[in-house]
Amino acid sequence: MMRRLIATISLSAVALVGIVASEGYTDRAVIPVPGDVPTIGFGTTEGVKMGETTTPPKALARALQDVGRYEGAVRQCVKVPLHQHEYDAYVSLAYNIGSRAFCGSTLVRKLNAEDYPGACLEILRWD
C-alpha cells in the first residue's frame, strides 16, 4: 500500500485504544514522576490542576480532544506522505512528548527529508 498525504488520514481506532491503554487511567490529578506536570484521566496534562477529579467517560472525551491537538501538530510539522501505521505512531509519540518536542525533533527533520527508516529509529530515542 502506498503512503498517503497526511491531510487524508486520521488516527485509527486501534491507535486511540493503544494510547489510552498505555497511558492508563487515574481518576484524580497526579504528578506521575517528580518534576512532571499534573496529569489526569488518560494522560491529559493541559489545564490540569492538583485536586481535580474525573470519570472514565469525561477522561476519554478529554483524551479525544488531546488527540485532536496532537494530530494537528503532526499535520503541521510533517510534510511527507505516511502509511496509516506511521501516522498512528507519530501521533502517539506526540501525545507522549508534546507538540513542541515532536515538531522540533530530529525525527521530524529525518521524516521530512524522506528518511523514513531513520525517523522510525528516532522513536526509540524517546523510550
Segments from the language model and where they lie:
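Cell-wall polysaccharide-cleaving catalytic domain and substrate-binding groove, primarily
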Residues: 1-127
